[in-house]
Amino acid sequence: MKNILITGANGQLGNEMRVLSAEHPEYTYFFTDIAELDICDEQAVLDFVKTNDIHVIVNCAAYTAVDKAEENVELCSKLNADAVGYLARAAEANQAEFIQISTDYVFDGTAHVPYKETEPTCPNSVYGRTKLAGEQHALTYCTRAMIIRTAWLYSTFGNNFVKTMIRLGKERDSLGVIFDQIGTPTYARDLARAIYAVIGQGVVPGVYHFSNEGVCSWYDFTKAIHRLAGITACQVKPLHTEEYPTPAKRPHYSVLDKSKIKMMFGIEIPYWEESLKECINALSF
């Protein structure tokens, strides 16, 4: 029986991992957030992993406030980079497998075809740079480390784009949304399913990409959210990125090539609209 540590358990992905754990009773779980384990405390991490004889670490914790990260560089770096190094070292010391969740923000977003794992990284934000540093720490300090980059994550838990667009769609007559940033939404439950598939088969070290299938803009995504949520009174208007400036630069193109993870682990990935429908049906609003 494997002992699995899942950090960031109160976040979107951590909560989805908890929900799906009921489908995998063969494992013993340790779901932690900062109250149970401060992953920025290296000794605490080492002690926890050793004491509980952890076999797999899934790090769902991260500083994800992309714009605030531009000002809170130290805190962002501590959580997204330093803490990943601590977890990786602890995994290596305990001969455990380590799954680190990363992001499309490690790329500059200037591509026109889906990013493969081998594409050069070039982050344009503090968030992206710290997440890339975390990737490097994971692969340097743990021989059984696997990076899964994802993008545009949403779920029924916490605050996210889907829930925000539903709320604003009910509050406003019109809404402006960016149409020239292209990517693929990722339902956190689908990512959690993929992670459990990896755990079941065993980590194969390296970098992988995962999002749902298909491509859309934030504008397209919003239109689909409103259609599936039955919101008809709010007019959604397309905006250029330049019309909505933000402290952190966003990738204009962040579609990820998922061929590697599908081939390596036999994972079938739903299209984003199918998963969005599943999520919205699960929401109470």
Where are these regions (language model features)?
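NAD(P)-dependent short-chain dehydrogenase/reductase
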Residues: 136-183, 189-190, 196-197
